[in-house]
């Protein structure tokens, strides 16, 4: 199969807002690829916005200057995958020239449509509105299987591509079960507006836990062998010896547990998230980092213990098993209550301890691997800032033809200008996209046909964010975390926008 077929399907999927049409287009492509398991695996990975190789060391810097496109499609899917694998296996810093040469060779053989697809795939910005459930439904349709069967296999196998390859080759998907040493998709939480909202949605009584601002880890132990996986299922065992040691100290033979790794200050308050995140880098000197930035691990769920699977067990049963195994110093603070006042006090105490909020877990909820269920609800304060839009990018997918991704700036009183602190297209409704496309044409500086449109700094926007982190990407040295648009502020002048000092105060 040609890369052209995948690129055109991706374009078609991005161009429609119909879920049924997206599913049908992807299913048709997968049906053509079956029963070739390698081909199916690659296509499902790519159309999910991922690479089978996961990381190949190619970022935006290597994709800035592309050769002219090829006139006719000739690249095959498996050939491109082999090239990406070769790029990813080049060793050391001295391989940058070789990597750049291979990237240039690949793109020179790609048509314009193929270049666009590869550029977005490698840049992590496929944006075709076909992740998660849509991809699973497409696999199910192509394989003639119930969607629930495909979803469960993907959750327990930790990989939709593997489940797709099995299903489309005629293999039984009931072989995908929880297996120690094979990571599964983590359960994710929906959002509650308050502890009172969480109590109501969980029937009046729920289990509140401290929500730590660390790094999610999935811990597997088989006898004296421990493997640690991230939320994205990357193996980081070698980087987290503290987690390995804490796991080996538990009186258990086989274990699958869910937890959080976090760097703490001497007074046990959490370090900034980036301190924890720095321990997960591929080039980190683990021994040196451990000496200066040690990690602690907190277990908050247990999915398997010594031959017994607990995925179908209610939260209360899983937590009882956890408490019987893990000492209190390695568990998160917890409160079971039906009293909104007690819940609010627990949230306040958790925030005062430096944590980011609380999780509410329904007592009877099962562990929904790889799914965002109402059985878990996160409650945390939301920060907002009034910032100025400095530039905007043309959208893709359902946002094609709209000015979408906005560049956000904070006011700098020292210079009278604005300092860029992030970008976002989150939170925008269709009506908002229509409005801002018209508005930004009115305040554009220079041409509007390029990918990025520069603007006069006149439009104030209110954004919600989860916090601020250090970043070398922006001039102010800071970047917003999970910024999303709340509303545009026609009532505010740019001189009333929040300052860069206000942004720093959230760090």
UniProtKB/Swiss-Prot annotation:
Cofactor requirement: Mg(2+)
Pfam families: DNA_ligase_A_C, DNA_ligase_A_M, DNA_ligase_A_N
Family label: Belongs to the ATP-dependent DNA ligase family.
PANTHER family attached to this UniProt entry: DNA LIGASE 1/3 FAMILY MEMBER (PTHR45674), DNA LIGASE-RELATED (PTHR45674:SF13)
Organism in which the protein naturally occurs: Mycobacterium tuberculosis (strain ATCC 25618 / H37Rv)
Function (record text): DNA ligase that seals nicks in double-stranded DNA during DNA replication, DNA recombination and DNA repair.
Name this protein carries in UniProt: DNA ligase B
Gene this chain is encoded by: ligB
Claim: DNA repair is one of the keywords in the record: yes
GO cellular component, one term: peptidoglycan-based cell wall
Gene Ontology BP annotations: cell division; DNA biosynthetic process; DNA recombination; DNA repair; DNA replication
Enzyme Commission code(s) on record: 6.5.1.1
């Amino acid at each position: 199969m040609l890369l052209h077929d995948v690129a055109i399907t991706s374009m078609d999927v991005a161009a429609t807002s119909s879920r049924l049409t997206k599913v049908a287009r992807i299913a048709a492509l997968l049906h053509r690829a079956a029963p070739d398991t390698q081909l199916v695996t690659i296509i499902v990975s790519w159309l999910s916005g991922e690479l089978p190789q996961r990381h190949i060391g190619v970022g935006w810097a290597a994709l800035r200057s592309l050769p002219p496109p090829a006139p006719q499609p000739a690249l095959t899917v498996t050939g491109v995958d082999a090239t990406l694998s070769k790029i990813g296996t080049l060793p050391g810093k001295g391989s940058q020239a070789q990597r750049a040469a291979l990237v240039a060779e690949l793109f020179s053989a790609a048509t314009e449509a193929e270049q666009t697809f590869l550029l977005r795939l490698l840049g992590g910005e496929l944006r075709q509105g076909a992740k998660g459930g849509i991809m699973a439904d497409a696999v199910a349709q192509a394989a003639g299987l119930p969607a629930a069967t495909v979803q469960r296999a993907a959750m327990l196998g930790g990989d939709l591509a593997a489940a797709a390859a099995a299903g489309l080759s005629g293999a039984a998907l009931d072989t995908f079960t929880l297996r120690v040493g094979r990571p599964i998709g983590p359960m994710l939480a929906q959002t509650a507006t308050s502890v009172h909202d969480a109590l109501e949605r969980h029937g009046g009584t729920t289990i509140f836990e401290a929500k730590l601002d660390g790094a999610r880890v999935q811990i597997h132990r088989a006898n004296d062998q421990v493997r640690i996986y991230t939320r994205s299922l990357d193996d980081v065992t070698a980087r987290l010896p503290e987690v390995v040691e804490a796991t080996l100290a538990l009186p258990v033979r086989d274990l699958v547990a869910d937890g959080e790794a976090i760097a703490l200050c001497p007074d046990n308050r959490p370090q900034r998230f980036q301190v924890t995140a720095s321990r997960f880098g591929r080039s980190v000197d683990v021994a040196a980092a451990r000496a200066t930035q040690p990690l602690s691990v907190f277990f908050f769920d247990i999915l398997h213990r010594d031959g017994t699977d607990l995925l179908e067990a209610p939260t209360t049963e899983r937590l009882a098993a956890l408490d019987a195994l893990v000492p209190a110093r390695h568990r998160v603070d917890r409160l079971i209550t039906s009293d909104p006042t007690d819940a609010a006090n627990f949230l306040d105490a958790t925030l005062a301890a430096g944590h980011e909020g609380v999780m509410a877990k329904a007592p009877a909820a099962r562990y929904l691997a790889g799914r965002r269920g109402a059985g878990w609800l996160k409650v945390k304060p939301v920060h907002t800032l009034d910032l100025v839009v400095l530039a905007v990018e043309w959208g893709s997918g359902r946002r094609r033809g709209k000015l979408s991704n906005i560049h956000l700036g904070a006011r700098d009183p020292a210079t009278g200008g604005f300092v860029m602190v992030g970008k976002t297209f989150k939170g925008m409704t269709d009506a908002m996209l229509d409005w801002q496309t018209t508005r930004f044409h009115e305040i554009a500086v220079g041409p509007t046909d390029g990918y990025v449109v520069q603007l006069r700094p006149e439009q104030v926007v209110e954004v919600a964010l989860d916090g601020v982190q250090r970043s070398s990407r922006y001039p102010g040295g800071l970047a917003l975390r999970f910024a999303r648009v709340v509303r545009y502020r026609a009532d505010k002048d740019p001189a009333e926008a929040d300052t860069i000092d206000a942004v720093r105060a959230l760090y």
